[in-house]
């Protein structure tokens, strides 16, 4: 994945997370929860829902994973160790015959364009499309549950 393939809406803030300013943005201001999360959901989260997302990240020290994770997304071949792992997984996913359910989001956010096209090349895959941006469980929970139920029913069972 290259920065020029990254969502225009998310590019600036994620570049900020990966810069020296990232610690202020995440650890002090909790921007992953306060900005990225609600900005990646089509509907508005209510106060009760937002408070539940905030709950694990009340203290600055508890926010470290929300800083480390954006810094580990493999972009422009960095960080190299993560790029290598993701590439090996991609190679494996492209070739294996394990049944897969691809829950596509429309309009989508990160998994769009060439990345989405690549996922569609995987063997033995069923695709469903639900309404959503990135955190699709918040926009289409029932549709996702129904898709999983239907897909599981299609998988042969060994007794």
Residue positions per predicted region:
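A short, basic/aromatic alpha-helical/loop segment that forms part
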Residues: 4, 109-110, 135-139
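Catalytic active-site module of serine/aspartate enzymes centered on a nucleophile-bearing elbow/loop
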Residues: 123-159
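Helix-loop "lid/cap" segments that line or gate small-molecule binding pockets
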Residues: 33-45, 52-58, 72-78
């Amino acid at each position: 994945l290259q920065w020029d393939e990254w969502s225009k809406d998310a590019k600036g803030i994620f570049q900020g997370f990966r810069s020296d300013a990232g610690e202020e943005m995440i650890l002090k201001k909790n921007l992953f929860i306060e900005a990225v999360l609600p900005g990646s959901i089509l509907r508005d989260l209510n106060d009760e829902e937002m408070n539940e997302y905030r709950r694990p990240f009340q203290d600055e020290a508890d926010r470290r994973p929300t800083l480390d994770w954006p810094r580990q997304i493999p972009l422009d071949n960095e960080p190299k160790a993560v790029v290598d792992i993701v590439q090996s997984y991609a190679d494996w996913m492209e070739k294996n015959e394990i049944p897969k359910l691809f829950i596509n989001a429309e309009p989508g956010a990160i998994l769009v364009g060439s990345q989405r096209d690549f996922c569609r090349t995987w063997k033995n895959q069923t695709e469903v499309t639900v309404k959503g941006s990135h955190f699709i469980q918040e926009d289409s929970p029932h549709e996702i549950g129904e898709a999983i139920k239907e897909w599981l029913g299609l998988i042969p069972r060994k007794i």
